[in-house]
Regions:
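A common structural microfeature
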Residues: 52-55, 67, 106, 140
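Single conserved hydrophobic/aromatic residue that forms the stacking wall/gate
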Residues: 171-173
Length: 173
């Protein structure tokens, strides 16, 4: 499966997470026209920063594959839906390429549970580590903690979700 197929599946699956504020309404997007965009293109959504700015995020799942069968969840294991999983490297590269092109200012990341909560969180941590360390990404990251993950891994995930600018500002205090 190519990266575009994965992006299509995993951004569509992420739309069920009600944490971003885009209405999903069409905003004049017309195929082939320059300058017209849609809030639903390529998994982009909008949210507001603490200072009131509207921020565009890449909203995706690491994976929509899940070992659980929660009846309320579209990604439950018995649901007949196309499945996809990014590697940490694919997710980091996709995010940084969207960022470099000014499509997004940050990442909203969640996931189905692959094997176990800890295993899934370790993959998320790897993706965020690549973004922060290798690509020096200083944008906004919202990473959803997977229920049942060990506290140590949740702490690592949270640390990587805080921007380095924010950390540096508090180091001088």
């Amino acid at each position: 499966m190519n990266l575009l197929d994965k992006l299509t599946i995993l951004s569509d699956a992420a739309k069920y997470d009600a944490a971003c504020t885009s209405s999903g309404a069409k905003r004049g997007y017309q195929e082939g026209k320059i300058g017209c965009t849609s809030t639903s293109v390529a998994g982009c959504c909008h949210t507001f920063s603490s200072d009131g700015r509207c921020v565009t995020l890449l909203k995706v799942l690491l994976s929509n594959d899940c070992c659980y069968n929660c009846k309320y969840c579209v990604n439950r294991c018995t649901n007949d839906t196309p499945r996809a999983t990014f590697t940490p490297e694919e997710l980091a590269e996709l995010t940084i390429e969207f960022y470099r092109r000014n499509y997004i200012e940050g990442l909203f990341l969640s996931s189905g549970v692959l094997r176990s909560p800890d295993y899934t969180t370790e993959l998320m941590i790897r993706a965020l580590s690549i973004l922060r360390s290798e690509y020096r990404f200083n944008g906004y990251i919202h990473a959803k903690a997977i229920p049942g993950t060990s506290p140590e891994l949740v702490e690592q995930l949270g640390f990587l979700s805080v921007s380095y600018t924010h950390l540096r500002a508090h180091e001088t205090v």
